Amino acid sequence: MNQTKNCVIVLSGGPDSTVVAYWAKKQGYDINCLSFKYGQIAEKETQQAALIAEKLGAPIKIIDMSSLREIFKGVTSLCDRNISLTSQFSAPIVVPFRNAIFLSVAVSYAVGIGATRIFYGAHGSDAANYPDCRPDFYKSLEETAWLGTEKTIQIQAPFCGISKAELLTVGANLGVPFELTWSCYLDGEKHCGKCESCVNRKAAFKEAGIQDPTQYA
């Protein structure tokens, strides 16, 4: 295996990280996927991530950190059913420092398998509301990883400069199976169609002019 083309993908099961995974494969990377159970209500995230990894022919490790629910309870509606979900962005949607947690684990994994790149699905539409989706965040974390491992590992969000709709267009051109991806904050058989993530998903497909294959309740 060529270590310079060996990468780790933080794969949530959503469309953004799935596009990144397909893009990395197209770039010739050997992709190794990580998905996380962090106490989220939407347990289908990791289920769909496993299906997507299988479709890609890539290995996946699902890391069970469900006990994080104990610190996210009362903080975020993604982990606590007693906090109402909203159809627009609101502070309780944010899972504090989530990407830092996931990317830190990804660094450890990358060291173990000799990967030199870590990719995750942050994009331009995220930057306004999510500090851990901004370039200054992941570049700072990259520097911390160098200091903490003495390994040259790059942390990148390849599509941080474009919108979610533009990202979906990239994915459509790559043949991403969007029907396998999961965005909803709930755990129903279908996307609820009403939570902020479902609303953003619908809007992005519409803006991109791509048929939305999602089944909504």
Segments predicted by a language model, with ranges:
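Short, intrinsically disordered, charge-biased short linear motifs at domain edges
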Residues: 170-173, 178-187
